[in-house]
């Protein structure tokens, strides 16, 4: 079905929950609302295309079947799936090359320099030991979109001091970020960790809210730097061995960017097909039937 229609239905459902005094959290992506979460009732209402499995569901294509041309819908949906699958394959290949970049670049890192530097950095910007372990909260601050990698720079507005590690591969910056993160948690300070949107696990940036201090990793797709920054260049933590893999790094980095660009092109194509699908459903303004169906299923 149409993403626009699904979002309108979720918005209408959230308004109904609000009228009925049901606690509801609205979950959004870069494109808009994709889910509603009711923690107290243990209910999740989500876009079926998000990959969440459930024995309950509402098929908008059936619910509004007589209001749009089915054959056009089938064609647009198939084209969108082809381009989405193509994008996924390129992103997976790009992730593999990114891992190879980190592996190659890690061969010439002087780890003793990183340990000494991060210790000095923490002593300068950290706080006193609290005698307990801090709590870590993981968030995404960047996302991969048809327009490229979007980065929410407002996340760093609360910081008075930011150390920016300029690193072409992320091999050095990830280690610096991780060590400062460990120092902070071990000293009892809560940490907000921002995870890489490509692999979903590597911590790229951190903020220590209580200290108003953050560490930011700047690479090819994170060129916009936060204000109040102090730049740290990754090259100072490498030995002369880096010259041996210089050409391989350059070639792999070029291939990585090429794969990412192909992924962006596929996402643009998928977005165009999505717009065609949205156009088919644009004349449907009444979402009451779908909202009522959601309410009935939740009451079963």
PLM regions and their residue ranges:
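Long, contiguous hydrophobic alpha-helical segments, chiefly transmembrane helices and signal peptides
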Residues: 87, 148, 177, 184, ...
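N-terminal pre-Walker A segment at the start of P-loop NTPase domains
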Residues: 112-154
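Glycine-rich phosphate-binding P-loop
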Residues: 1-14, 149-150, 154, 158-184
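Alpha-helix initiation/capping motif
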Residues: 2, 47, 62-69, 110, ...
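Conserved nucleotide-sensing/catalytic segment adjacent to the nucleotide-binding pocket
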Residues: 14-81, 183-261
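An accessory alpha-helical subdomain
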Residues: 72-126, 248-297
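Rhodanese-like catalytic fold shared by cysteine-dependent sulfurtransferases
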Residues: 32-34, 48, 121-135, 250, ...
């Amino acid at each position: 079905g149409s993403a626009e229609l699904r979002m309108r239905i979720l918005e209408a459902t959230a308004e109904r929950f609000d009228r009925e005094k049901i606690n509801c959290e609205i979950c959004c992506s870069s494109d808009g609302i994709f889910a509603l979460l009711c923690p107290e009732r243990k209910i999740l209402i989500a876009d079926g295309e998000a990959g969440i499995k459930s024995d309950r569901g509402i098929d908008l294509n059936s619910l509004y079947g007589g209001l749009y041309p089915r054959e056009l819908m089938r064609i647009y949906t198939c084209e969108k799936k082809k381009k989405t699958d193509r994008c996924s394959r390129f992103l997976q290949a790009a992730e593999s090359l990114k891992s190879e970049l980190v592996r190659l670049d890690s061969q010439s890192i002087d780890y003793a320099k990183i340990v000494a530097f991060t210790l000095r950095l923490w002593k300068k910007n950290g706080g006193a030991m609290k005698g307990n372990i801090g709590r870590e909260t993981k968030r995404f601050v960047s996302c991969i979109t048809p327009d490229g990698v979007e980065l929410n720079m407002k996340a760093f507005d609360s910081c008075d001091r930011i150390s920016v590690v300029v690193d072409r591969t992320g091999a050095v910056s990830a280690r610096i970020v991780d060590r400062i993160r460990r120092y902070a948690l071990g000293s009892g300070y809560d940490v907000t960790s921002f995870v890489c949107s490509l692999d979903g696990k590597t911590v790229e940036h951190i903020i220590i809210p209580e200290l108003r201090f953050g560490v930011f990793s700047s690479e090819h797709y994170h060129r916009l730097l936060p204000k109040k920054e102090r730049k740290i260049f990754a090259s100072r933590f490498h030995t002369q061995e880096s010259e041996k893999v210089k050409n391989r790094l350059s070639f792999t980095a070029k291939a990585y960017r090429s794969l990412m660009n192909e992924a962006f092109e596929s996402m643009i194509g998928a977005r165009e097909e999505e717009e065609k699908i949205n156009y088919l459903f644009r004349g449907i303004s009444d979402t009451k039937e779908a909202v009522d169906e959601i309410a009935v299923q939740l009451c079963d």
